[in-house]
């Protein structure tokens, strides 16, 4: 079991501990539960889906990286496939506060970058901030997404974001988590190709500035993040954050990164290079390359 889970695991009910122990035994537990695993946990504990998600939130929150706030938020995004995806907030010392990742963004990106097609619900241990409510409104589930909070009845996103502004106001038809392929040729080594593939999946209807980041760890594992724009602009999630979300949730740490590649267009209206390289250097990665989409 990864050490970060030990305290939260010890506080779970005995029957949930017994059912989870073989799942968490792998140090690189992928911070997700398949539909089959969810069904098994429900049978072992007698909990329904909502109660089980609440019970698992401490494990999601244990994935948080909060050196500034020490305020750990966990989220679980429930995909239409039946898979549940953990998420947690992340803060980066030496970077800017604008690089911060919120738990809801983490769980949603985890699902999206894992190939999930849409979300049914998200469970969070604290009420979503306005930034996250706006981020969720970019999803193809839209205002129907169900939000579950401890001690409250579940409500749709529309109840938390009345009179919402979103992609439909800008006549955007392709939404976040819809399948997209921008068709750039995969060239270069494996890491460069991973970054280009991530750029091909970008959701960037507002700036038309595709980008993707791929991180290579010392053991050869590669984590890729795609750019995810938002109708309100500021809640946009950069591609580096997508890759860092996966790296963190899958049990790796920043010193494990040995090389990074950013893929973007040289003449794009928005350029990721400066922010990406500055944040990576703050995390200790200095081997950073850029490949141009063509």
From Swiss-Prot:
GO molecular function: cytidine deaminase activity; identical protein binding; zinc ion binding
PROSITE patterns in UniProt: CYT_DCMP_DEAMINASES_1, CYT_DCMP_DEAMINASES_2
UniProt entry keywords in alphabetical sequence: Hydrolase, Metal-binding, Zinc
Binding-site list for substrate: 89-91
Pfam families in UniProt: dCMP_cyt_deam_1, dCMP_cyt_deam_2
Residues at the active site: 104
Disulfide-bond pairs as recorded: none
Cofactor(s) the protein needs: Zn(2+)
GO biological process: cytidine deamination
Domain CMP/dCMP-type deaminase: 48-168, 186-294
The record's free-text note on cofactor binding: Binds 1 zinc ion.
Binding site for Zn(2+): 102, 129, 132
The enzyme's E.C. designation: 3.5.4.5
InterPro entries associated with the record: APOBEC/CMP_deaminase_Zn-bd, CMP_dCMP_dom, Cyd/dCyd_deaminase_Zn-bd, Cyt/Deoxycyt_deaminase, Cyt_deam_dimer, Cytidine_deaminase-like, Cytidine_deaminase_bacteria
Catalytic reaction(s) noted: cytidine + H2O + H(+) = uridine + NH4(+); 2'-deoxycytidine + H2O + H(+) = 2'-deoxyuridine + NH4(+)
An annotated GO cellular component: cytosol
Assembly with partners or alone: Homodimer.
NCBIfam families the record matches: cyt_deam_dimer, PRK09027.1
Function: This enzyme scavenges exogenous and endogenous cytidine and 2'-deoxycytidine for UMP synthesis.
Family: Belongs to the cytidine and deoxycytidylate deaminase family.
Protein name: Cytidine deaminase
Lineage: Bacteria, Pseudomonadati, Pseudomonadota, Gammaproteobacteria, Enterobacterales
């Amino acid at each position: 079991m990864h050490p970060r889970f030990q305290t939260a695991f010890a506080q779970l009910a005995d029957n949930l501990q017994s059912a989870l122990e073989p799942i968490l035994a792998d140090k690189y537990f992928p911070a997700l539960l398949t539909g089959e695993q969810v069904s098994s946990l429900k049978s072992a504990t007698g909990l329904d889906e909502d109660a089980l998600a609440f019970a698992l939130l401490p494990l999601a929150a244990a994935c948080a990286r909060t050196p500034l706030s020490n305020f750990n938020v966990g989220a679980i995004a429930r995909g239409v496939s039946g898979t549940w995806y953990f998420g947690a907030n992340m803060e980066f010392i030496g970077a800017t506060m604008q690089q911060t990742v919120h738990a809801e963004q983490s769980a949603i990106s985890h699902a999206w970058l894992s190939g999930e097609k849409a979300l049914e619900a998200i469970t969070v241990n604290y009420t979503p901030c306005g930034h996250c409510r706006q981020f969720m409104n970019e999803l193809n589930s839209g205002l129907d997404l169900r939000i579950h909070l401890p001690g409250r009845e579940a409500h749709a996103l529309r109840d938390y974001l009345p009179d919402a502004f979103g992609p439909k106001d800008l006549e955007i038809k392709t939404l976040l988590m819809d399948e997209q392929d921008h068709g750039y040729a995969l060239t270069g080594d494996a890491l460069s190709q991973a970054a280009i593939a991530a750029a091909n999946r970008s959701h960037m209807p507002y700036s038309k500035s595709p980008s993707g980041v791929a991180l290579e760890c010392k053991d050869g594992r590669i984590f890729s993040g795609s750019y995810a724009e938002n109708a309100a602009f500021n809640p946009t999630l950069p591609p580096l954050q997508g890759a860092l979300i996966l790296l963190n949730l899958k049990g790796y740490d920043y010193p494990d990164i040995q090389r990074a590649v950013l893929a973007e267009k040289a003449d794009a209206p928005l350029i990721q290079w400066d922010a990406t390289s500055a944040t990576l250097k703050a995390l200790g990665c200095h081997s950073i390359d850029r490949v141009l989409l063509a």
